[in-house]
């Protein structure tokens, strides 16, 4: 028997005070578009470890306090997107090789036409409409 299982994407929606950290993709799909630090889980890591690793690789941030916030299923491409929120202790960022640029955006300056994926748009909308985030907010598409 050969199983084809969906891929799991872990990510972090990092925020500092009332600004959200977005990164501009330097890879396809979505080259030049804005997203949040996220990527495919690797073997032998937990979802939290994968999300933290992606945040470190893409924007050089430490995310110590992760709160599961969104589960977004994408059946047409067999992916499940799982996103944590993380309030950052500082606004220091270091752009990694998969990122063209990174910046903190206030809610009214998010570049909506240039957001990369529907899962990211869904997550940003849920974050903004429920800010400030408490421990019991959780959303599924």
Question: Which positions does each model-derived feature cover?
Answer:
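Surface loops and adjacent helix of pleckstrin homology
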Residues: 7, 25, 115
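Unchanged
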Residues: 41-126, 133-141
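Short glycine/proline-enriched turns and hinge-like loops at secondary-structure junctions
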Residues: 6, 33-35, 78, 96
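Conserved Nudix-box catalytic region and its N-terminal flanking loop in Nudix hydrolases
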Residues: 15-57
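A generic structural signal for short beta-strands and their flanking turns/coil linkers
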Residues: 8-10, 30-32, 64, 80-82
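Conserved beta-strand and immediately adjacent loop positions that scaffold enzyme active sites
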Residues: 11, 19, 101
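Acidic, metal-coordinating catalytic segment for phosphate/diphosphate chemistry
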Residues: 1-12
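Short acidic-hydrophobic surface loop/beta-edge motif
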Residues: 12-14, 72
């Amino acid at each position: 028997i050969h199983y084809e299982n969906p891929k799991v994407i872990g990510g972090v929606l990092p925020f500092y005070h009332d600004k959200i950290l977005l990164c501009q993709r330097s890879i396809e799909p979505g080259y030049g578009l804005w997203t949040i630090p996220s990527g495919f889980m690797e073997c032998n890591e937990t979802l939290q470890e994968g999300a933290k690793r992606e945040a470190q690789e893409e924007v050089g941030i430490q995310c110590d306090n992760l709160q599961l916030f969104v589960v977004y299923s994408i059946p047409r491409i067999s992916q499940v997107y799982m996103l944590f929120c993380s309030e950052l202790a500082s606004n220091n960022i270091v752009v990694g090789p998969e990122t063209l640029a990174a910046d903190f955006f206030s809610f009214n300056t998010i570049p909506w036409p240039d957001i990369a994926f529907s899962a990211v748009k869904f997550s940003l909308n849920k974050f903004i409409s429920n800010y400030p985030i408490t421990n019991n907010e959780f959303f599924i598409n």
